[in-house]
Regions:
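Bacterial signal peptide processing site
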Residues: 23-27
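Short, charged/polar surface micro-motifs in flexible loops or helix N-caps
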Residues: 79-86
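C-terminal motif of bacterial Sec signal peptides marking the signal peptidase cleavage site
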Residues: 18-22
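Extracytosolic low-complexity repeat regions of secreted or lipid-anchored proteins
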Residues: 88-168
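Bacterial N-terminal signal peptides that target proteins for export
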Residues: 1-12
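Secreted/processed peptides and extracellular or luminal domains of membrane proteins
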Residues: 29, 46-47, 83, 95, ...
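N-terminal secretory signal peptides
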Residues: 28-79
Length: 168
């Protein structure tokens, strides 16, 4: 192979490297305390390639997942299961989710599984991704691999006791 052709090929490869590196940026995340739970490994190894039109990205922490560029969906597995909460709790496809809307003015929600051990938490930019799409994509994995604790969503009306009937 002529030397000039090899030099040209090397220059072409070097010119492409920055573009390839930009396509494979890793999302920086923090693992949860229980990230080494085998149930999390089962879920992470089966995460979908795409959710709500957002493509999966590499992360730098165990038991995490990310989708979108920039990342609009972040998943962390291995959190402690939440106890009773004042947050809205919404069941979807056999999985109960606590919904934290405290950052809704910035298009952000945090969804946390309720009644599953360990818990999964999703950070969501709802301007870019649908919470229904996320729940639909992840519910089968959560049902199959995260054991239910027996806790379920309930509302204040579920807990109210009827007023006693006056005695005649």
């Amino acid at each position: 192979m002529p030397r000039s052709f090899r030099s040209l090929a090397l220059i072409a490869v070097l010119a492409l490297l920055p573009g390839l590196a930009a396509c494979s940026t890793t999302v920086a995340m923090q693992p949860a305390k229980g990230a080494n739970d085998p149930a999390c490994a089962e879920i992470i190894s089966r995460l979908p390639q795409s959710i709500s039109g957002q493509e999966r990205r590499w992360t730098d922490a165990q038991a995490t997942g990310a989708w979108g560029d920039p990342a609009s969906i972040l998943l962390t597995c291995g959190l402690e299961a939440p106890g009773p909460s004042t947050l809205p709790c919404r069941p979807f496809d056999g999985v109960d989710w606590l919904v934290d809307e405290s950052q809704a003015d910035q298009n952000r929600y945090t969804l946390t599984t309720f009644g599953r051990e360990p818990a999964v938490q999703i950070y969501l930019d709802y301007a870019e991704a649908s919470s229904a799409d996320i729940a639909q994509a992840l519910a089968p994995l959560i049902r199959d691999y995260l054991p239910a604790t027996g806790s379920v969503c309930s509302s204040a009306s579920d807990l109210q006791t009827p007023a006693p009937t006056p005695a005649p």
